[in-house]
């Protein structure tokens, strides 16, 4: 059976009733049932749930149930974090405010309790109890009162802060509230001095920040890449740093500084100068507390630079005070050790160099600072000139002047100035470090002046240290600063630099120095000798070095002239390589970016799926825990009710008194009932035994009492009977007298009323008459009104029923019309679907047919290409063999590139003249290639329209060149023909190249062809788009090498240049008969106007054009004989050539 649940508003009323009767636990259970019931979670708005939530949290605070408050807050967040964030914020702030108020009230109560105890007895302030308690626990009354009264509320408030932070850490809408609660938690730790809770709070916030940086941006997730989030985190860490410094938790302060630096590095926006100044100030304080004087001075120097550069209203006094602070902190840095490698023998997690590098990163420095570098930076910034005269003298005495006898006296005056000046309170911590640096300077300067010195004399010079401190500094200087010092306690003397053979490293003095140590002089003797000898050689031979430099310069110039062209080409080539490399890298970057984008998208998808799975698992886990908690709560409730029920009985109280709280919690209701029954049985047995033991006593005692009572009872009854008789007689007499008096009064009253009978009868008659007429009149009016209302209602019912019948008829007509329209629409939709399906099947059949035709044509094309390649290879081999035979005969009458023979030496025919120059052939070949490319483009367009022709215009250049080099061009004419040619013929003596490509006739023919091509352009592009799209959708193949499909079958031709393929886009051109007729007419016109070439023995027409028709006359016999001889000499080369 399902559990009965109340509506939220009813639950709130019920909870208020429980509170009024003093049952807050029942009220809290009632409200908790509402939040546990998912039926009401999302059915009501925040206006209904928010008052209930406030009451729920109020009860949790009153009863100190922080875990129950956490459960309710999480449920409320899930309901309203995406709907109304302000409501969630108000609820959380109200909860924390109530917890803080109760904690403050507990603190005031604790203080008041201690005050009452203290003022209880002024004569006995120290009571024996207080003395014993202080001896046992070591606490005073305030501590004990706080532990009993204040500490539970402090713990509750701390748990409340932690729960709210955990609640809001992943909600981007509540970022400001999250950081406000973090600051409130810091204030809580400061107010109640909770250092351990402060450390846990810092760890919790650091863990939350790491989770934000790792997690992806969800729907309500917090993204660290947003500027607002970064600024809020930065402000919170700065507040954390201030709180840690106030509580003197320097380790937490250092971790906060690391977090702040990481956030500033992560932010794309530069932090404001005020934030940076606060950061450097706190960092310098942390370094000072850690005893790291070097980085403390570096942080102060960064703060001084930032303030000097960015603060506009900086006064001279402030600048002087900051400069003095920086200068004194820098001078107080201990002198660096000459043995930094000693630290690597110390077992630690990180080496000192790594630690120093990490600290330098916090200051924004590229490398760790040193004392020398900081002093150099201080001098560069002109800090010594900004301070007062005393501090300027301090710098000069420590870092510039060499005066060991007066050094300590001078420094002592500065120390006195710092200690006596109230404005120098910030500089007091540097006094001891300054004294140590001064003593070390003194020892170093004394070692450069004296070889030995008395201990007492050195103590006089070091005025502000005793003998033990001085000896310790001497030992430390030997250990860390690589100084040769020997103390002779017998003679009470100190010896410096006695071992002249020991000097492990180069000595670089830090600060003022008079001379180097003797061991250093001996170690660098060879270096000094080399320097002196080099200087002497330059003085003895002053021109040698100049001549060497001039010779070296000439060699460099000559070498430059030798390699400049090569280097120039190399640089240009390198530039080209760089450009290619850039293009390659750009392509790689683009590909990588695309791959990265795909990978990120995939990772984002996987992360979303994982997050969704995690949320589902968490939801299941929460449901499981909630179910377990409900079962446990039911058990506890039943146990509590059972215990309460048992405690109401005497034997139950007795049984419970034998058990403690832990024992009761371990038992369940059945075990308690069992113990109760056992207790009842035991008590019953005890009672039965007692009764049996007392039965005899009671029996005899009762019998004795009754025997003694008999005479007394008889006397009492006799006296009582006499008294009762007297009382009855007196009472009866009084009753009779009263009855007689009442009778007399009633008779007198009746006599007085008899005279009013006639008046009564008259009044009744008049009243009856008057009311009868009024009744009749009202009855008539009522019947008339009733009849009128009946008629009106009948008329209204007739009209209403008539209107209802009309509306029903219209509704039926409308439904019939809609039904018919729906049937027509469904029929039309079915017809359209059938037509679409038919069109789709038709398109698929057409595509399949075209695909099969394409595959068939493609096989034909591959076969034709293979045959063309074989013919080309065969012809190239034949041409090569023919070329070898002709080179043996050495055609002397027609040398290539030389002077052409005159007409008198040989009147060869027009087609036997030498081939054009290579450049002319190449030009014409290039022209063919260009026109071939145009044909390829047009052919590609026809292929997209579904054509199946293939145009190989790209091969025209190769075939033309092969034809130009073929054997017929270099064969000799027979001597008989040369002799038979008349020398006085009308043929021109110079060469006529009109038959060649590019002549006048061919030019007209090409112009006409080009004009036709231009006319065909628009017709080719007229219907190209849709078919191209359809072919692209079908995945139509398009060749990229220039060849394309044609509608005509492939001709098997030879490898000669005359076999170049023709244009395949003829479907849009003029018919072939009309084009041939135009060409013949053009030729006829040209023959009529051209000079007669037949007399010279040449061919009359241009052989490159279309062949002669049937109507033309046969060629002359001499031409036929010449043709036979050429064919015989070509070795069958022209037999396979088909006429166009």
From Swiss-Prot:
<dbReference type="Pfam" id="PF01399">
    <property type="entry name" value="PCI"/>
</dbReference>
<keyword id="KW-0963">Cytoplasm</keyword>
<feature type="compositionally biased region" description="Basic and acidic residues">
    <location>
        <begin position="1109"/>
        <end position="1130"/>
    </location>
</feature>
<dbReference type="InterPro" id="IPR027512">
    <property type="entry name" value="EIF3A"/>
</dbReference>
<feature type="region of interest" description="Disordered">
    <location>
        <begin position="588"/>
        <end position="630"/>
    </location>
</feature>
<dbReference type="GO" id="GO:0033290">
    <property type="term" value="C:eukaryotic 48S preinitiation complex"/>
</dbReference>
<comment type="similarity">
    <text>Belongs to the eIF-3 subunit A family.</text>
</comment>
<feature type="compositionally biased region" description="Basic and acidic residues">
    <location>
        <begin position="588"/>
        <end position="623"/>
    </location>
</feature>
<comment type="subunit">
    <text>Component of the eukaryotic translation initiation factor 3 (eIF-3) complex. The eIF-3 complex interacts with pix.</text>
</comment>
<keyword id="KW-0648">Protein biosynthesis</keyword>
<dbReference type="GO" id="GO:0002188">
    <property type="term" value="P:translation reinitiation"/>
</dbReference>
<feature type="compositionally biased region" description="Basic and acidic residues">
    <location>
        <begin position="990"/>
        <end position="1051"/>
    </location>
</feature>
<feature type="compositionally biased region" description="Basic and acidic residues">
    <location>
        <begin position="829"/>
        <end position="899"/>
    </location>
</feature>
<dbReference type="GO" id="GO:0005829">
    <property type="term" value="C:cytosol"/>
</dbReference>
<dbReference type="GO" id="GO:0006446">
    <property type="term" value="P:regulation of translational initiation"/>
</dbReference>
<feature type="compositionally biased region" description="Basic and acidic residues">
    <location>
        <begin position="920"/>
        <end position="976"/>
    </location>
</feature>
<feature type="modified residue" description="Phosphoserine">
    <location>
        <position position="908"/>
    </location>
</feature>
<dbReference type="GO" id="GO:0001732">
    <property type="term" value="P:formation of cytoplasmic translation initiation complex"/>
</dbReference>
<dbReference type="InterPro" id="IPR000717">
    <property type="entry name" value="PCI_dom"/>
</dbReference>
<feature type="compositionally biased region" description="Basic and acidic residues">
    <location>
        <begin position="1059"/>
        <end position="1086"/>
    </location>
</feature>
<dbReference type="GO" id="GO:0016282">
    <property type="term" value="C:eukaryotic 43S preinitiation complex"/>
</dbReference>
<keyword id="KW-0597">Phosphoprotein</keyword>
<dbReference type="GO" id="GO:0005852">
    <property type="term" value="C:eukaryotic translation initiation factor 3 complex"/>
</dbReference>
<dbReference type="Pfam" id="PF22591">
    <property type="entry name" value="eIF3a_PCI_TPR-like"/>
</dbReference>
<keyword id="KW-0396">Initiation factor</keyword>
<dbReference type="GO" id="GO:0043614">
    <property type="term" value="C:multi-eIF complex"/>
</dbReference>
<dbReference type="GO" id="GO:0003729">
    <property type="term" value="F:mRNA binding"/>
</dbReference>
<dbReference type="GO" id="GO:0003743">
    <property type="term" value="F:translation initiation factor activity"/>
</dbReference>
<dbReference type="GO" id="GO:0071541">
    <property type="term" value="C:eukaryotic translation initiation factor 3 complex, eIF3m"/>
</dbReference>
<dbReference type="GO" id="GO:0071540">
    <property type="term" value="C:eukaryotic translation initiation factor 3 complex, eIF3e"/>
</dbReference>
<dbReference type="InterPro" id="IPR054711">
    <property type="entry name" value="eIF3a_PCI_TPR-like"/>
</dbReference>
<dbReference type="GO" id="GO:0006413">
    <property type="term" value="P:translational initiation"/>
</dbReference>
<comment type="function">
    <text>RNA-binding component of the eukaryotic translation initiation factor 3 (eIF-3) complex, which is involved in protein synthesis of a specialized repertoire of mRNAs and, together with other initiation factors, stimulates binding of mRNA and methionyl-tRNAi to the 40S ribosome. The eIF-3 complex specifically targets and initiates translation of a subset of mRNAs involved in cell proliferation.</text>
</comment>
<feature type="domain" description="PCI">
    <location>
        <begin position="319"/>
        <end position="501"/>
    </location>
</feature>
<keyword id="KW-0694">RNA-binding</keyword>
<feature type="region of interest" description="Disordered">
    <location>
        <begin position="829"/>
        <end position="1140"/>
    </location>
</feature>
<protein>
    <recommendedName>
        <fullName>Eukaryotic translation initiation factor 3 subunit A</fullName>
    </recommendedName>
</protein>
């Amino acid at each position: 059976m399902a559990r009965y649940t109340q509506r939220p508003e009813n639950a709130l009323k019920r909870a208020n009733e429980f509170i009024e009767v003093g049952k807050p636990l029942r009220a809290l259970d009632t409200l908790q049932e509402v939040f546990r019931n998912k039926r009401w979670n999302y059915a009501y708005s925040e206006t209904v749930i928010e008052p209930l939530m406030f009451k729920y949290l109020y009860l949790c605070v009153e009863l100190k149930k922080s875990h129950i408050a956490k459960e309710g807050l999480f449920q409320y967040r899930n309901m309203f974090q995406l709907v109304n964030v302000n409501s969630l914020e108000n609820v959380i702030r109200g909860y924390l405010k109530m917890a803080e108020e109760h904690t403050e009230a507990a603190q005031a109560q604790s203080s008041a309790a201690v005050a009452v105890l203290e003022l209880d007895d002024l004569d006995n302030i120290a009571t024996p109890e207080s003395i014993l308690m202080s001896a046992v626990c070591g606490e005073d009354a305030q501590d004990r009162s706080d532990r009993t009264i204040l500490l539970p509320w402090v713990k509750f408030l701390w748990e409340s802060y932690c729960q709210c932070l955990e609640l809001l850490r992943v909600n981007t809408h509540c970022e400001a509230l999250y950081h406000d609660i973090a600051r409130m938690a810091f204030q809580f730790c400061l107010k109640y001095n909770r250092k351990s809770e402060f450390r846990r709070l810092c760890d919790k916030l650091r863990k939350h920040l790491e989770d934000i940086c790792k997690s992806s941006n969800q729907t309500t997730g917090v993204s660290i890449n947003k500027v607002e989030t970064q600024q809020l985190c930065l402000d919170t860490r700065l507040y954390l740093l201030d709180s840690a410094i106030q509580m003197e938790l320097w380790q937490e302060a250092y971790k906060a500084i690391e977090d702040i630096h990481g956030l500033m590095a992560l932010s794309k926006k530069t932090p404001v100068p005020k934030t940076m100044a606060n950061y450097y100030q706190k960092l310098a304080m942390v370094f000072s507390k850690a005893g790291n004087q070097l980085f403390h001075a570096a942080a102060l120097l960064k703060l001084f630079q930032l303030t000097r550069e960015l603060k506009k209203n900086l006064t001279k006094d402030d600048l002087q005070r900051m400069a003095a602070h920086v200068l004194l902190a820098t001078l107080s840095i201990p002198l660096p050790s000459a043995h930094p490698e000693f630290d690597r023998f110390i077992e630690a997690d990180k080496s000192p160099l790594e630690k120093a590098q990490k600290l330098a990163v916090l200051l924004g420095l590229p490398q760790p600072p040193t004392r020398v570098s900081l002093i150099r930076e201080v001098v560069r910034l002109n800090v010594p000139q900004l301070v007062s005269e005393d501090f300027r003298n301090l710098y000069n005495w420590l870092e510039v002047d060499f005066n060991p006898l007066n050094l300590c006296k001078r420094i002592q005056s500065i120390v006195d100035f710092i200690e006596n000046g109230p404005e120098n309170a910030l500089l007091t911590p540097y006094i001891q470090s300054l004294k140590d640096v001064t003593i070390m300077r003194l020892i170093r300067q004394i070692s450069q002046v004296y070889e030995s010195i008395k201990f007492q004399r050195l103590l006089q010079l070091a005025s502000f240290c005793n003998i033990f401190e001085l000896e310790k500094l001497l030992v430390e200087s030997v250990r860390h600063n690589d100084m040769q010092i020997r103390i002779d306690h017998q003679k009470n003397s100190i010896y410096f630099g006695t071992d002249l053979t020991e000097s492990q490293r180069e000595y670089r003095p830090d600060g003022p120095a008079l001379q180097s140590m003797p061991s250093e002089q001996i170690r660098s003797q060879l270096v000094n000798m080399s320097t002196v000898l080099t200087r002497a050689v330059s003085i003895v031979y002053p021109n040698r070095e100049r001549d060497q430099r001039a010779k070296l310069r000439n060699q460099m110039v000559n070498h430059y002239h030798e390699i400049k062209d090569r280097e120039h080409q190399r640089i240009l080539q390198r530039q080209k390589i760089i450009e290619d490399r850039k293009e390659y890298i750009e392509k790689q970057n683009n590909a990588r970016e695309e791959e990265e984008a795909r990978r990120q998208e995939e990772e984002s998808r996987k992360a979303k799926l994982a997050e969704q799975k995690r949320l589902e698992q968490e939801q299941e886990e929460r449901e499981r825990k909630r179910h377990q908690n409900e079962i446990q709560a039911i058990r506890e409730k039943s146990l509590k009710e059972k215990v309460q029920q048992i405690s109401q009985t005497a034997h139950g109280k007795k049984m419970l008194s034998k058990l403690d709280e832990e024992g009761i919690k371990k038992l369940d209701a059945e075990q308690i009932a069992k113990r109760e029954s056992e207790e009842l049985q035991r008590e019953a047995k005890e009672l039965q035994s007692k009764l049996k033991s007392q039965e005899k006593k009671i029996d005899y005692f009762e019998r004795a009492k009754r025997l003694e009572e008999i005479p007394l009872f008889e006397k009492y009854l006799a006296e009582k009977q006499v008294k009762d008789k007297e009382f009855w007689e007196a009472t009866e007499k009084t009753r009779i007298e009263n009855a007689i008096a009442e009778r007399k009064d009633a008779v007198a009253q009746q006599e007085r009323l008899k005279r009013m009978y006639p008046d009564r009868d008259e009044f009744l008659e008049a009243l009856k008459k008057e009311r009868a007429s009024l009744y009749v009149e009202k009855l008539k009016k009522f019947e008339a009104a009733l009849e009128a209302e009946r008629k009106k209602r009948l008329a209204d019912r007739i009209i209403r029923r008539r209107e209802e019948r009309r509306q029903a008829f219209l509704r039926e007509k409308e439904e019939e019309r809609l039904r018919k329209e729906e049937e027509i629409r469904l029929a039309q939709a079915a017809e359209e679907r059938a037509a679409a399906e038919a069109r789709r099947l038709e398109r698929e059949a057409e595509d399949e047919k075209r695909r099969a035709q394409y595959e068939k044509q493609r096989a034909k094309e591959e076969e034709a290409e293979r045959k063309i390649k074989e013919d080309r290879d065969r012809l190239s081999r034949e041409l090569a063999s023919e070329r070898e035979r002709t080179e043996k005969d050495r055609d002397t009458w027609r040398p290539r590139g030389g002077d052409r023979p005159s007409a008198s030496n040989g009147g060869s025919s027009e087609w036997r003249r030498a081939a054009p120059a290579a450049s002319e052939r190449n030009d014409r070949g290039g022209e063919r290639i260009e026109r071939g490319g145009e044909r390829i483009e047009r052919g590609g367009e026809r292929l997209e329209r579904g054509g199946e022709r293939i145009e190989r215009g790209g091969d025209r250049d190769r075939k033309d060149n092969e034809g130009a080099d073929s054997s017929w061009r270099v064969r000799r004419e027979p001597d008989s023909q040369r002799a038979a040619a008349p020398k006085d013929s009308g043929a021109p003596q110079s060469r006529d190249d009109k038959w060649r490509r590019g002549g006048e006739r061919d030019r007209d023919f090409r112009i006409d062809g080009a004009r036709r091509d231009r006319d065909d352009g628009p017709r080719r592009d007229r219907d190209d788009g849709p078919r191209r799209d359809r072919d692209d959708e079908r995945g139509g193949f398009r060749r990229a090498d220039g060849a394309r499909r044609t509608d005509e079958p492939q001709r098997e031709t030879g490898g000669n240049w005359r076999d170049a393929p023709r244009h395949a886009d003829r479907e849009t051109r003029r018919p072939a008969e009309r084009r041939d007729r135009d060409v013949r007419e053009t030729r006829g016109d040209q023959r009529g106007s051209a000079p007669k070439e037949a007399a010279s023995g040449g061919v009359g027409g241009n052989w490159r054009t279309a062949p002669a028709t049937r109507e033309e006359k046969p060629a002359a016999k001499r031409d036929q004989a010449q043709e036979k001889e050429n064919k015989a000499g070509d070795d069958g080369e022209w037999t396979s050539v088909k006429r166009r």
